[in-house]
C-alpha cells in the first residue's frame, strides 16, 4: 500500500490522474487544486465541465481550508454519519474553479477508509473523487467493473483492492444552503 500511495502522489503532483479505491466506489482522482488536472478528468469521463465533482479529504479539521463560512449543522451531520457522506457546501475556496458548481459550491467527503485517508494525508491536498465511469454509464461497484476506456485513460492505477469483488455503493449526499437549509440529494 505504501508504494501505491507514493506513486499516486508523484503522478498527481505532476498533474496526472489516477484510478483508486475510496471509501465508496472506485474513483478517478487528481489534485483538486490543479485546474488542468481537473480538466483531464472531465475529458476522460466525457463530462460537461459545468457538472461539479466532489473532493475527498482525510480530516474534518481541514474543511475550513476549502469552505468559507462552515455551517454549524455540517459538524453535526459529519459526527452522526454512519455511512460515507458527501456534503455540498455553499461557498468553496482554495480549490480549482472548474471543480466547483456554477453557484460556487463544492461537495466534500471526509474519508475514513484506510487507503484513501492515507493517500490524502500523504498528498497534503484534497483529491478529486469522481466515479470511475464515462458520464451517463453505471458507476462501477468494484475494480473489475471499471471500463477499459477509463483504465487506459489514467496515468496510474492503484493496485490496492483490485481483487476485492464486494460491491460498493456511492455516498449519501446532502446539500447545505445559506442559512442552514438542508436538502437530501441521495
Please report, for each region that a protein language model flagged, where it lies by residue:
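Active-site-adjacent structural elements in enzyme catalytic cores
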Residues: 1-186
